[in-house]
Amino acid sequence: MITSKKELKRVLEIESNSYQLSISQRILGLFGLSERGIIWNYQNRLRKYEYHLNCNHRVRSTIYHFLVNRLSFRYGMAIEPNAVDEGMHICHVGKILIRGKVGKYSTIHIHVSLVGGACDIAPVCGDNVYFGIGSTIVGGIKVGSNVCIGAGAVVTSDVESNCTVAGVPAKIINRRGPLDWH
């Protein structure tokens, strides 16, 4: 939860370094012409919205809420404020729905969904989780740290730390975690 300008600056610097954007890519992202620029623009606005929301800056949080929602509708990325901790890396522009808690240094591909099930309790994921393309995490489950969720996997039960899961429903396929994926 970002509650100070110093912390906001630190989080933005960490996340900015993962995209390695040039000035021209950042500018092109403002006009929707650079994929990494678009992602960074969305992420930058989301983090500033979180900061202003957490500090009860009503006018600024309303402005950033509008800016984040505008990009969400345009590109299909819907991440709730304070849902993802620092170090989030979004790989591609596309449908992303996060309505749960995700720890530090997560990697998120397109068509990823973290949603509550019928009980409407959101999933909780640990640090350093890799979400493959089209992965879905449903219900009030817990995903441990250092976990890879394979492409198209549907996770419906708790996942222990340091493993890779895949399939429908997701099952552990190895215990090496993200070492195989990076």
Features from the language model and the residues they span:
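Terminal amphipathic alpha-helical/low-complexity segments used for targeting or macromolecular assembly
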Residues: 1-75, 180-182
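Left-handed beta-helix
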Residues: 75, 80, 85-87, 91-92, ...
